[in-house]
Every structure is written in structure tokens, then in C-alpha cells.
Amino acid sequence: MTKGTTSMGQRHGRTHILCRRCGRNSYHVQWERCAACAYPRASRRRYNWSVKAIKRRRTGTGRCRYLKVVNRRIANHFKTPKA
């Protein structure tokens, strides 16, 4: 078997699977470490040289269930409904 480009076509195994924390296909099976969020490390992987990547993951990109409620309450000056 040669060691160049032809041997690259022989690869069938999966190196990465879905990550529990970020949900991306970046969890390395052998190293047991996510390439995207560094799970299982407590602090998330985040570098300043990838500002675009940080913007993709930060607050406001998901469902924002609680933030929607807070914004509505701010607009109404935190008035409580009268029964």
C-alpha cells in the first residue's frame, strides 16, 4: 500500500461524533475532547482571533426564551398585571 493520496481513500472510520454540549460533529472519539467547545473542560473554547465564530454562538443566536420576556417587561416599565 502506498503512503500518498491513494491511501487517503481507504479511510472509513469516524474520528468525530456529535458533541453533547455544542451539538456539533466535533467531538473526537479517541481524544475524548470536542474541537469546537472543548467539552468536557469546564470553560468553553473561545478565542479572540475568531470573532465571527464567537458571534455565531453568543447570546441572541438561540431561542432566548427568558430574554424575550425581560425585554417585554422593560418596555412596559415592569408593571404587574392587575387582577
Curated annotation (Swiss-Prot):
RNA-binding listed as a keyword: yes
Entry binding sites for Zn(2+): C19, C22, C34, C37
Disulphide bridges, residue numbers: none
GO terms (BP aspect): translation
Cofactor annotation remark: Binds 1 zinc ion per subunit.
GO molecular function: rRNA binding; structural constituent of ribosome; zinc ion binding
Cofactors: Zn(2+)
C4-type zinc finger segments: 19-37
Highest taxon of the lineage: Eukaryota
Coiled-coil region: none
CC per GO annotation: cytosolic large ribosomal subunit
Keywords: Metal-binding, Ribonucleoprotein, Ribosomal protein, RNA-binding, rRNA-binding, Zinc, Zinc-finger
Family: Belongs to the eukaryotic ribosomal protein eL37 family.
Function according to Swiss-Prot or TrEMBL: Binds to the 23S rRNA.
Miscellaneous comment in the UniProt entry for this protein: There are two genes for L37 in L.infantum.
Identification of the protein by name: Large ribosomal subunit protein eL37
UniProt organism field: Leishmania infantum
Gene coding for it: RPL37
